[in-house]
Amino acid sequence: MTSDLSPSRGAAPHAAPLGAVARVEEAQLLEAALLSGAHVLLEGPPGTGKSTLLRQVAHNREIPFVLVEGNAELTPARLIGHFDPALVLERGYAAEIFEDGPLLEAMRTGGLLYVEELNRIPEETLNVLLAAMSEKEIAVPRLGRVVAASGFGLVAAMNPFDAVGTARVSSALYDRTCRISMGYQSAAAERDIVTLHSPDIDDAWRAKVVALVRASREHDALEWGSAVRGAIDIARIAVELAQLRGVAVDDWHVGLAAAEVSLSGRIRLHDSTGRSPEDVVREMYERIFGPEPTDDSADDADSAGSPGEP
């Protein structure tokens, strides 16, 4: 890749400012790697801003951006493209009836191919990517040789800690990429991220929501916890649920309900735990937000907030 990153069709959409998600250094490293012609592997758990990082870099430099989700169904044909079967019967294997897949679209436009969940891709599909990365060209049967336009690059992302439905990434791929490790952001950065999505909620309550999500990453019963997306959803759901119930956003029961629905599917329990996700979420919630208020404590709070009888 050269430093010619001129705009073309399919420019990346706008994303959150990188300063707001504490990824300025990673953005500089990614941009420098792409400008140098290197391909990049972003490694980190879900919700650490890998997609946001790439989208913002691509948006800022107006680089064409093609997204493909890695999974077991991503065959070489789906990645490269195919001839339209109906038109083949009429016109034969003419180049103009070939429908580009995401790889050829990125190569022809000199854009970035962003591959999510790289370690879920079948080996034969991964070999196609390796060839395109190494040679900046591929040979397509009945279509011929496709050479990548200036600016083409591949950025892949994966969660190296997820062992379910994934395969070990070969050393050949690591040898062809520069690796940027992306861990969880600081508590302050995560509070800023939640603020972007729910700016009107109380700062102290928002801080507790972030503390709850961060606690899930260290709980002994959990194999892994939630990323900041869980905190974003807790805040959003609590706002709507409080309106439906006619109570304050920081109502204890509203917060618990929002936390259970937002986190129970994001956390993963150890097989030997013998507990439900909701049970663990409630335990953490009570530790951060305090025990469930009783009717007496609610009455005391109401009395404290009202003038007494003379």
Predicted regions and their residues:
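Conserved AAA+ ATPase small/helical "lid" subdomain
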Residues: I201-D250
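Short, conserved alpha-helical segments within structured domains
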Residues: G49-K50, S226-A231, G255
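Phosphate/oxyanion-binding loops and surfaces in catalytic or ligand/nucleic-acid-binding neighborhoods
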Residues: A86, A238-L241, V261-R266
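C-terminal engagement/docking regions of AAA+ P-loop ATPases
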Residues: A248-P310
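AAA+ P-loop NTPase catalytic core and its hallmark functional loops
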Residues: M1-A207
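Short acidic/histidine-centered micro-motifs embedded in hydrophobic/aromatic stretches
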Residues: A132, L212, A258
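A general alpha-helix detector
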Residues: R176, A189-I193, A215, D233-I237, ...
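Generic alpha-helical structural element
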Residues: G19, L118, D220-A227, T273
